[in-house]
Protein backbone atom coordinates (compact mmCIF):
# COMPACT_ATOMS: atom_id res chain seq x y z
CA UNK A 1 0.00 0.00 0.00
CA UNK A 2 1.21 3.47 -0.89
CA UNK A 3 1.06 6.69 1.04
CA UNK A 4 -1.68 9.18 0.58
CA UNK A 5 -0.73 12.16 -1.63
CA UNK A 6 -0.12 15.34 0.35
CA UNK A 7 -1.85 18.51 -0.73
CA UNK A 8 0.43 21.39 -1.59
CA UNK A 9 -0.36 25.00 -0.84
CA UNK A 10 -0.75 27.18 -3.93
CA UNK A 11 2.17 29.56 -4.51
CA UNK A 12 1.66 33.01 -2.98
CA UNK A 13 0.31 35.69 -5.30
CA UNK A 14 2.71 38.45 -6.28
CA UNK A 15 1.88 41.87 -4.89
CA UNK A 16 1.79 44.96 -7.07
CA UNK A 17 5.17 46.64 -6.71
CA UNK A 18 4.61 49.58 -9.05
CA UNK A 19 3.78 53.06 -7.82
CA UNK A 20 1.32 55.54 -9.22
CA UNK A 21 2.65 58.47 -11.21
CA UNK A 22 2.89 61.98 -9.78
CA UNK A 23 3.88 63.77 -13.01
CA UNK A 24 1.48 63.93 -15.92
CA UNK A 25 1.07 65.21 -19.47
CA UNK A 26 -0.45 68.68 -19.73
CA UNK A 27 -3.75 68.72 -21.68
CA UNK A 28 -3.10 72.30 -22.87
CA UNK A 29 0.53 72.29 -24.07
CA UNK A 30 0.94 68.46 -24.44
CA UNK A 31 4.35 68.37 -22.76
CA UNK A 32 5.02 65.01 -21.12
CA UNK A 33 5.65 64.93 -17.37
CA UNK A 34 5.32 68.69 -17.03
CA UNK A 35 2.42 68.72 -14.54
CA UNK A 36 3.17 68.29 -10.84
CA UNK A 37 0.52 67.50 -8.22
CA UNK A 38 0.64 68.86 -4.69
CA UNK A 39 -1.68 67.28 -2.14
CA UNK A 40 -2.54 69.52 0.83
CA UNK A 41 -4.16 67.06 3.24
CA UNK A 42 -4.60 69.70 5.96
CA UNK A 43 -6.79 71.86 3.71
CA UNK A 44 -8.26 68.92 1.73
CA UNK A 45 -7.20 70.39 -1.62
CA UNK A 46 -5.17 69.05 -4.50
CA UNK A 47 -3.38 71.44 -6.86
CA UNK A 48 -1.94 70.43 -10.22
CA UNK A 49 0.18 72.89 -12.19
CA UNK A 50 2.09 72.79 -15.46
CA UNK A 51 5.68 74.02 -15.34
CA UNK A 52 5.71 74.91 -19.06
CA UNK A 53 2.45 76.80 -19.72
CA UNK A 54 1.78 77.68 -16.03
CA UNK A 55 -1.79 76.34 -16.19
CA UNK A 56 -3.18 75.43 -12.76
CA UNK A 57 -6.17 73.49 -11.41
CA UNK A 58 -7.41 73.02 -7.85
CA UNK A 59 -9.90 70.43 -6.60
CA UNK A 60 -11.16 69.15 -3.24
CA UNK A 61 -9.71 65.81 -2.11
CA UNK A 62 -10.41 63.19 0.55
CA UNK A 63 -8.05 61.11 2.63
CA UNK A 64 -8.28 58.36 -0.02
CA UNK A 65 -7.37 60.61 -2.97
CA UNK A 66 -4.16 60.11 -4.93
CA UNK A 67 -2.41 62.42 -7.43
CA UNK A 68 -3.95 60.52 -10.34
CA UNK A 69 -7.41 61.44 -8.98
CA UNK A 70 -6.54 65.15 -9.13
CA UNK A 71 -5.32 64.73 -12.71
CA UNK A 72 -8.48 62.87 -13.76
CA UNK A 73 -10.64 65.62 -12.19
CA UNK A 74 -8.68 68.16 -14.25
CA UNK A 75 -9.21 66.21 -17.46
CA UNK A 76 -12.93 65.86 -16.70
CA UNK A 77 -13.22 69.61 -16.06
CA UNK A 78 -11.46 70.34 -19.37
CA UNK A 79 -13.84 68.05 -21.26
CA UNK A 80 -16.86 69.62 -19.54
CA UNK A 81 -15.66 73.11 -20.49
CA UNK A 82 -15.24 72.06 -24.14
CA UNK A 83 -18.87 70.98 -24.44
Swiss-Prot record:
What is the originating organism of this protein? Homo sapiens (Human)
Q: Gene3D superfamilies per the record?
A: 2.20.25.190
The UniProt family comment states: Belongs to the ELOF1 family.
- Give the highest taxon in the source lineage: Eukaryota
Q: Give yes or no: UniProt keyword DNA repair.
A: yes
Which coarse location class describes where this protein primarily resides? nucleus
Which UniProt keywords are listed? Chromosome, DNA damage, DNA repair, Nucleus, Zinc
Fetch the PANTHER family from UniProt: TRANSCRIPTION ELONGATION FACTOR 1 HOMOLOG (PTHR20934:SF0)
Record: residues binding Zn(2+): 26, 29, 50, 53
Q: What name is this protein filed under? A: Transcription elongation factor 1 homolog
| Role summary | Factor involved in transcription-coupled nucleotide excision repair (TC-NER), a mechanism that rapidly removes RNA polymerase II-blocking lesions from the transcribed strand of active genes. Acts as a key adapter required to anchor TC-NER factors to RNA polymerase II: stably positions UVSSA and the DCX(ERCC8) complex (also named CSA complex) on arrested RNA polymerase II, leading to neddylation and activation of the DCX(ERCC8) complex and ubiquitination of RNA polymerase II.
**Tell me, how does this one assemble?**
Associates with RNA polymerase II.
Any one GO biological process = transcription elongation by RNA polymerase II
Listed GO CC annotations = chromosome; nucleus; transcription elongation factor complex
Classification lineage: Eukaryota, Metazoa, Chordata, Craniata, Vertebrata
Care to name a GO molecular-function term for this sequence? RNA polymerase II complex binding
Q: Where in the cell is it found?
A: Nucleus; Chromosome
Amino acid sequence: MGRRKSKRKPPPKKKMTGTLETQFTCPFCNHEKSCDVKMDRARNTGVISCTVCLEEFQTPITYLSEPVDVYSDWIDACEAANQ
